[in-house]
Amino acid sequence: MKKIAKIITLVLCISLCFSACKGKEISEESTTSSPEQTTSADDSFAITDGKVVLPYNKTDGINPFFAESYENIYLSMLIYEPLFSVDSNYDTTGIVADSIGISGKVATVRIKHNVVCRGYENINAHDVVYSFNLAKASYYWGNNLDGITNAQAIDDYTVSFSLNFKDLYVAGKMNFPIVKTGTADSKNSIPAGSGKYYFTQDRLVSVADGNKIISLVETSNRDSVEDALNIGMVDVFFSDLSDENYKVAVGNTKEITLSNMIYLGLNSNRGALNKYIRSAIAAKIDSDNIALSSYQGHAVGFKLPIAPESTVAGNVAKIETKGNKELANNIIDRCGYTRYSGSAKTNGAYLLSFSLIVNRDNQFRVAAAYNIADSLAECGFLINVQVLSFADYSERISSGNYDMYLGEVKLDGSMDISRFFMDGTKFSAGINKSEKAATEYFRYRAGEISEKEYYEVFAEEYPFVPVAFRTGYTVLSEDIKTLDLKQMPFSLYGGIQ
């Protein structure tokens, strides 16, 4: 089997070029200051004439801890600031936070003393704890905070966060909005914040210059936003394509790579699905083809569990995204699967015959499941695609009652995948937590091994197979076509002054 491991390592072409500059990692037992956020004329869009109009869902409310629409969540980021912002490269910058230090399972964040909150005292540690508790329980921010169990104010400008495990990259999770204590308790509340704008009478007014006004037009759903853009009522439309509905809108369209990872779950408790066969499956899957055909071009093929546009991906991974039939067959043959039994290859002990379950509510994913089944058939696999209701699909996964499943998960700003390797999560059933891809992950997050070393291990074992990252799209009117989207997918309006 050592020969198989060598083949996987060499032929997959994991050209791991590790950079000495690691912007996201915090040194152990240290406190690292975060640079002030700066905005230049070259990468910002200035509101000067009060004519910019953005969509607003009035029934959803502007409270960021209760809002569910993208329109209002993105609007709220102009009104409220996070501890750390996360840009399109998944690099973090301290906004309300001045610094962060990691010691064991504790992250200590120091708050800037001069974060002004209009009409209130400056933001302090108690406000951060209040905001964290609301974010942890919220629809949009809750999943981002997996791995952070609680927060406690140590003094007026220091917050201690308790972690599930030592995590030098945890700042990427801390992009939730900070508001003043007691101002965000209900859906109809308009919390007090420290952002560039404040909300009043269905419009946003610049804190620095009251003449800078952003008008808001009420919209009830995504279709109404798009209609409003097409007739010139609003200047921005965004869709994450979760409804699988792509329309051609009037304006300047920009495709945005989201943090939504499409992946193939593999049950390692099935005898045939050892790390070698899993690697053969990963080699044969053509991520580029799935992105282009199954997702109609609205995805980016990538075979590591890190965002393809992130700094980490640029430093670490060069993995072939096209299918490699020769490599897959080589691995399968060396595992003894050299003859057929019916329509599937066998090694005498196991048969390469599996079921692949998929949620029937997502037609992109259903198409991808059949694509994978057809592709693997070329190497002697017999894959029975089972299209299930969401309830049945979810129950099968959480109970570990599956061979393979095609899933999707939204990664947070730190690209944490610990949920796949921790007991008790719906993602971990069927994953062998004693294999190196699981155990080494926590050493990587603790800073004991480099990102280069960890993702090399992952690509040798593939506890699950990342397939692609979905994309959404933004349409900008002619009036704001120069708006910089450098903070997407986390902040649509980050480029507005």
Task: Describe each PLM feature range.
Residues L54-I102, N133:
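N-terminal lobe/hinge region of extracytoplasmic solute-binding protein
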Residues L54, L229, A377-G424:
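Periplasmic binding protein-like
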Residues N384-Y393, S418-I480, Q497:
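Extracytoplasmic/peripheral linker and loop segments enriched in polar/acidic and small residues
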Residues E68, D98-Y140:
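Aromatic- and charge-enriched surface segment that lines or borders ligand/interaction sites
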Residues G101, V106, W141-A184, Y198, ...:
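Surface-exposed binding/hinge segments that line
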Residues N274-N371:
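Append "and occasionally in soluble cytosolic enzymes with long acidic Gly/Pro-rich linkers
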